[in-house]
Regions:
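Positions that flank functional sites
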Residues: 18, 43, 61, 169-170
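Conserved C-terminal helix/tail region of periplasmic/extracytoplasmic solute-binding proteins
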Residues: 148-182
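Helix N-cap/coil-helix junction residues
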Residues: 8-10, 116, 159-160, 181
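Hydrophobic alpha-helix position signal
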Residues: 3, 46, 110-111, 154-155, ...
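Secondary-structure end/capping motifs
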Residues: 77-161
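Bilobed "Venus flytrap"/periplasmic-binding protein-like clamshell domains
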Residues: 1-48, 144-149
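Pocket-lining segment of extracytoplasmic ligand-binding domains
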Residues: 23-114
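Residues that form or immediately flank small-molecule/cofactor binding pockets and catalytic motifs
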Residues: 20, 58-59, 172-175
Length: 182
């Protein structure tokens, strides 16, 4: 979709499967790859090195559920208290991340966990929150229209056969409801 938005069509490029943003970054840095999808902080770091950002996935899919925590339904059902506690912890974490009063602490955490510098960490936060692009939950809630967009993308890629199931097939909201987050 992003390639088509840029005017490229099938046959204009070839794909090479490289799993992991840091591995794709290494392919780009070595010159073996001409362009690669990168996540943060690699995209910020490479832009600062002079590489050109060709686009952003949010340009073509602005409403997408990016991250989830998955558990087997059978395990979750027998560990409901842990599921609710985890949901509450995630809610507190996302509220903390969004609060500008904690920005410096969040920047330090990004630096410590990713190895990026503070400038890159601030750029990552700006990407998500300045303005708020709806990428990250406000308090750990599930973006069901974003899940539906993921299902549609998987259908387009042939990973889920038609007819496409509803997003609710893949998500059990009871723990988020019990935690007061959904």
């Amino acid at each position: 979709m992003l390639l088509a938005k840029g005017g490229l069509h099938d046959g204009d490029y070839r794909f090479k499967e490289i799993i992991g943003s840091s591995q794709r970054a290494a392919c780009l840095a070595s010159g073996e790859c001409d362009a690669v999808p990168l996540s943060q902080p690699e995209d910020v770091v490479f832009a600062r090195k002079g590489f050109v950002k060709l686009g952003d996935s949010l340009e073509v899919v602005p409403n997408l559920q990016f991250n989830v925590i998955a558990a087997r339904r059978s395990w979750a059902a027998t560990h409901a208290n842990a599921m609710v506690a985890l949901a509450r912890a995630f809610g507190a974490t996302f509220r903390f991340l969004r609060d500008p009063a904690h920005r410096n602490e969040v920047v330090r955490a990004i630096v410590e966990t990713t190895g990026a510098d503070a400038t890159a960490a601030r750029a990552i936060l700006a990407l998500y929150y300045e303005p708020d692009r709806g990428v990250m939950p406000k308090q750990g809630e599930m973006n069901m229209s974003g899940v539906a967009a993921v299902v549609a993308l998987l259908g387009t890629a042939g990973r889920i056969p038609p007819p496409l199931p509803p997003a609710e097939r893949f998500v059990d909201l009871r723990y988020l409801h019990e935690a007061g987050l959904q």
